[in-house]
Each structure stands twice: as structure tokens, then as C-alpha cells.
């Protein structure tokens, strides 16, 4: 079941809200929690019942391991350590076998059917890391053993199950624990705010990400024939597709959670406004980077053991992140290159701080001059960061190294209009029909192409305006005054946006991070 489907929006979500609110109104928090768990199982089993069985078995095993930590037998340090290593190997082993063995094994064996029957449950990477973090926190005695229902809800809570955000136990168990203890007064549902945020995310996915996907799919399938202009347009389109697809999903998950009175962490914080690549990765897929920072980077020593060790630790984080995304060489190169960029950014930032300290004792710069210089430097930094991100996307999206080479070589091929017109012609939307008819009558030779070009540049303008806005969707909804909610123009605008997005569901498309 997908968020962007008629069944989910018109049947599942209303049924969930009605049952959940009815139980909350009767102050039956534990029953509301059980109902939420059942609905989450239904949501997940809609992909395949065997997925739900796999998840249930993994949950029971991890919960059992957590319970063993409190027994007298595992109070001894070596036994406790053995239990932790065994549980970690169990989780990581299941992830490795299901996600990586088929691809790696097929390449080594040269047969595509050898590992075809291995199960790959949807969202495996997310709920495995979620439970791995919980077990590590239990081992380090940062978490107590929770009741079963709150723990089950923490793992299977459907808005975060398939594509994140990658929640941690310390931010979710207290909320589900309050429901379990029938403290329903602590749950503050916000139906209006949640619906608006869900609509914003829905529109991002349907009206922006899926439209940019048309140009992206054409560009990467035509990699040998592209030129500089078309390649840049394709890469920018892919950057926006990736962002609006994933942040759209996150906004929808945040909106659903807001309706239910459950708080989940944000996953994006205006990443395209980052002034360096290091800051970019602090703003993009924030919960995944938080996981790798807390459970990989810091245990390796973080930045406490000198410059070289810090650089190696950063590279390790990005290589692990690359492996999390997939086992192909393109992903490894993507992770390694991003790691090198972040190491260089870290070194330059450290050097810049030292230069500022040295200049502190010299002549003081005027406030206006300093502000102007910082503004110019910030703008240049944003452009550089965006361009670096675009280059790394070649590795992230390419199917193999041959396609990587084709795309890089196209950056040195200058023709006009080349494949650019063919690319924009993929943006053939039903909404353009009237405009195309008028344009053809006025300009028989070039009318349609002008409409396609106008569509592409309109999408680009809207995308740039959104990513460069001072507030993202969540901040916008959170800061809106109550009077705004009650205004008829605002309600009509949100309603039109929702209906327009719903009408765009001509074909259900999966979210990009579904495959991870």
C-alpha cells in the first residue's frame, strides 16, 4: 500500500482516523494503540503477507534479546557482550542475505535465477536499523525494556516503516507508552494541520517529483547521445525529483502523524540552501545521517583522535551509507566521493575558523562590509554545493560505470538544441492540451515545442522557489496562526491543491527510496 494511492487516501486513512479518534475520545489509549498496530500490519501486509510474517518474527527475536539483558545470566559482562554481538549479527545477517546476496551472488555466479527466491521485504533497511539502534541502546543501558505493545508500535508504525524517517526508541517509545498507560490526554491530534502538511507532501510527489521523473528517465536512457545542456537539465531535474519525492513522502508521514498526535522527526531542513557539502549532509536525510553519526562515526572515535583519523571516520560513514543504499560499484563510488568532499569541506572550514581567529586582533571590519562579504560567500557556497551534488548524482542514478562514463563525456559535448527539445517533449501533460492547440494555430512549426519549453521552465521556477524558500512545508504549517486555518480562501486553496494532486493519480508510482 502506498501513500499516493486511491485506496490509502480514500479508504485506509479515513478508516484509521475514525477508529483511532473514537477510541481516544472514550479514553481507551491502549485500545487505540492496539488499533494503530493492527492498521500498520494491514498497511504492511498489503505489499505481501510474507513481509508481515518476516517482520513479526524479527520483532519477536529482538524483543526477546532485549528481555534477556535483564536476566541474571546475562548480567555478566562477557555474556552480555556475546548476546549483543549475536543479536547484531542476526539483524545485519538478515539484511545482508535479503538485500545484498542476490545481487552480489548473481554477479559472482553469473546466473540471474540462482538467488531469485530470496525474500526482500519492503522497508527492510529501515526497520532493521531501527531495531539495531534499540539493541545497542539496551546494551549500553540507555533504554529500559519496554512493554511489548509500545515496542511493536515503535517498529511497525506505518508512516515510518517503509521509507523512514529512521526513528529512534527514545523519541517514540515514550509516546506509545503514554497510549499504553491510557494517558490519552498527552496525545494532541491536529487534523487540520496534518491534512495541510499531507497535502503539501502529496503535491510535491504528484505535481513535481513525478513530472521531473519523465525528463530524468528519458535522459538516463539516452545517456550516449546527450550534450552539455541536456545533461545539466537532466541532472537538475533528478536532484529535484529526488528531493520532492523523498521530502514529499516525509511531509505526508509527518502530516499523518500530526493527525494522530504522534511526533516524528523531520528528515530535511532546506538542504539546497547549504553553503558547503558538509552542511548539506546535515540537512539531507537527517535521521539516516544521525544514525550513522551516533552508531558508526562516534564509536570509531569521531573527531577526537586527530585530523587523519577524523577523515578516515568520515569516509567510513559515507561508505557504510553507500552500502546501505546498494551493493553496486556506482553506489560505493558515490559514497566515497561524497566522503572525500565532506573531508575537504571539514578541513577548509577548520582552516577558515583559524584565519578568523588570526584576523580578530587586526583592524575591525565594518558590520555592513562583513554582512555583504558573508552574503556573497554564502551565495557562491550554495552554487558550488549544488553543482557538487549534481555531479555525485551521476553515480547515484547510473546503472553501471559505462553509463557514468557516457554522462561525464556528454558534459564536454556542446550541440544546440541537441536532445534538449526531445527531453522537454516528454513533459506532455493533459493540462497542456489547450495550450498546445492554441500554440499550433499561432505558430504551426514551433508552437508545441514552445509549450513544452514553457512547461519545463515553469517546473524549474516553482522548484527553485520552493527549495530556496525561508521555510519548508513543516515549518510553514507549524507557524501558521489559527486565524489562517479558519479562513475560507486558505481552505479553498488547500482543497484545490489536494483535489488536483488526487486527479493526477492516473498511475500509482512508487517513491524512489522504496527500493532502499
Question: Which positions does each model-derived feature cover?
Answer:
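Membrane-embedded transmembrane alpha-helical bundles that form the catalytic cores
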Residues: 1-467, 471-515
Amino acid at each position: 500500500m502506498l501513500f499516493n494511492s486511491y485506496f490509502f487516501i480514500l479508504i485506509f486513512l479515513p478508516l484509521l482516523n475514525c477508529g483511532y479518534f473514537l477510541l481516544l475520545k472514550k479514553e481507551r489509549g491502549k485500545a487505540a494503540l492496539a488499533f494503530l498496530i493492527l492498521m500498520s500490519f494491514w498497511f504492511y501486509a498489503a505489499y505481501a503477507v510474507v513481509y508481515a510474517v518476516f517482520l513479526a518474527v524479527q520483532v519477536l527475536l529482538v524483543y526477546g534479546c532485549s528481555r534477556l539483558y535483564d536476566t541474571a545470566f546475562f548480567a555478566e559482562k562477557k555474556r552480555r557482550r556475546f548476546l549483543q554481538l549475536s543479536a547484531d549479527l542476526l539483524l545485519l545477517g538478515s539484511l545482508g542475505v535479503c538485500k545484498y546476496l542476490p545481487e552480489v551472488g548473481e554477479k559472482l555466479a553469473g546466473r540471474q535465477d540462482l538467488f531469485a527466491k530470496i525474500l526482500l521485504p519492503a522497508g527492510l533497511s529501515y526497520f532493521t536499523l531501527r531495531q539495531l539502534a534499540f539493541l545497542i541502546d539496551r546494551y549500553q543501558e540507555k533504554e529500559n525494556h519496554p512493554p511489548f505493545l509500545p515496542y511493536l508500535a515503535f517498529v511497525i508504525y506505518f508512516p515510518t516503516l517503509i521509507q523512514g524517517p529512521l526513528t529512534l526508541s527514545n523519541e517514540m517509545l515514550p509516546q506509545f507508552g503514554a497510549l499504553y498507560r491510557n494517558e490519552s490526554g498527552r496525545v494532541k491530534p491536529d487534523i487540520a494541520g496534518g491534512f495541510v502538511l499531507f497535502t503539501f507532501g502529496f503535491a510535491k510527489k504528484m505535481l513535481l517529483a513525478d513530472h521531473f521523473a519523465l525528463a530524468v528517465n528519458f535522459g538516463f536512457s539516452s545517456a550516449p547521445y546527450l550534450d552539455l545542456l541536456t545533461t545539466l537539465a537532466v541532472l537538475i531535474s533528478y536532484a529535484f525529483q529526488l528531493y520532492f519525492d523523498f521530502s514529499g513522502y516525509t511531509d505526508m508521514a509527518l502530516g499523518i502523524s500530526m493527525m494522530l498526535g504522534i511526533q516524528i522527526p523531520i528528515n530535511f531542513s532546506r538542504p539546497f540552501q547549504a553553503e558547503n557539502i558538509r552542511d548539506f549532509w546535515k540537512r539531507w536525510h537527517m535521521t539516516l545521517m544521525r544514525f550513522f553519526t551516533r552508531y558508526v562515526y562516534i564509536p570509531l572515535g569521531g573527531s577526537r583522535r586527530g585530523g587523519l583519523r577524523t577523515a578516515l571516520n568520515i569516509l567510513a560513514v559515507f561508505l557504510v551509507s553507500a552500502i546501505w543504499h546498494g551493493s553496486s560499484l556506482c553506489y560505493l563510488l558515490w559514497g566515497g566521493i561524497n566522503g572525500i568532499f565532506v573531508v575537504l569541506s571539514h578541513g577548509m572550514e577548520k582552516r577558515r575558523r583559524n584565519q578568523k581567529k588570526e584576523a580578530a586582533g587586526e583592524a575591525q571590519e565594518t558590520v555592513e562590509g562583513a554582512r555583504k562579504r558573508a552574503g556573497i560567500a554564502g551565495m557562491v557556497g550554495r552554487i558550488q554545493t549544488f553543482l557538487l551534488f549534481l555531479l555525485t548524482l551521476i553515480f547515484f542514478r547510473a546503472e553501471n560505470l559505462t553509463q557514468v562514463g557516457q554522462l561525464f563525456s556528454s558534459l564536454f559535448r556542446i550541440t544546440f538544441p541537441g536532445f534538449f527539445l526531445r527531453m522537454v517533449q516528454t513533459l506532455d501533460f493533459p493540462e497542456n492540451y489547450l495550450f498546445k492547440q492554441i500554440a499550433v494555430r499561432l505558430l504551426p512549426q514551433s508552437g508545441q515545442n514552445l509549450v513544452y519549453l514553457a512547461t519545463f521552465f515553469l517546473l524549474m521556477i516553482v522548484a527553485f522557489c520552493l527549495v530556496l524558500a525561508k521555510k519548508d512545508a513543516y515549518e510553514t504549517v507549524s507557524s501558521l496562526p489559527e486565524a489562517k486555518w479558519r479562513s475560507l480562501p486558505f481552505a479553498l486553496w488547500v482543497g484545490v491543491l489536494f483535489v488536483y494532486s488526487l486527479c493526477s493519480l492516473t498511475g500509482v508510482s512508487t517513491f524512489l527510496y522504496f527500493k532502499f
